[in-house]
């Protein structure tokens, strides 16, 4: 797709990850 969706995901180990869907 021509757009992407990104959001912050907080895991149970308190680590911040960026999840992006293209």
Swiss-Prot record:
Inducing or repressing factors: Expressed in both exponential and stationary phase in rich medium; expression is higher in stationary phase (at protein level).
Domain of life: Bacteria
Name by which UniProt lists this protein: Protein YkiE
Provenance organism: Escherichia coli (strain K12)
